[in-house]
Amino acid sequence: MARAVEILAQVYEKNRAARNTPPVPIDRPVVLANEHVVFELGKTTRVQVERAFGVAFAFPMRGWHTYAAREDAERRFLSLFYAESGLVALEYYVPKLAGTPSLSPRDYGAFRLTPGDVALGASTATLDERYVTAVGGPAPVVYAEAFEVRFPGGVAYVMGNGGRVERLGLYTAT
C-alpha cells in the first residue's frame, strides 16, 4: 500500500511540474481571419479594420473596440485592443453576460483561428496537437476548458465549456 501511495505521489508531482511549464512556441504567428481581414498582432492596424468593418463600439471598457458579428445565425462579439494604432489583443466570443450591449450583429463572414482552423462552436476535442492545456492563463471561472498555443510575440487561447469552443483570444506577450 505504501508503495502505491509513493507511485501516485510521483505521478502527481511529475504532472504538476509539467503543467506549470509553458509549451514551446510554434514558428509562425497565430491569426484570426475571415474573407475580409487577417488579424495579426503587431501588423493589423485600426485603419485597416475600420475600413473593412466601420467604427466599433467601446466595450467591455474604454480602450476595447467591439463589433457584433453574426455567424451561424448566432450573435458573437469581436473585441480588439490597439496600442499606437497596431493590434495588441483580440477576443472573438459568444457573449455570455446579461448586460451586454444590444449591438445589431452584422454578417462579416466566418472567423477562424489559424493554424488549426479553430472556430467558435467547434469541439475542443478536435483541436490539433499545437493546442495544449493552458499554463497560467485564463482561470476556470467562466470557462471550464482553456487551451493555448504560444508563438513569437504572443499567445493564443481557446476557451470553452462542455466540449465546445466559446472564446478565442490573441494577446501580445509582454
What function would you assign to each model-found segment?
Residues M1-Y143, M159-T174:
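Short helix/turn-capping signatures at newly exposed starts of structured segments
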Residues E148-R150, G154-G162:
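Short, exposed beta-strand-loop hairpins at the edges of beta-sheets
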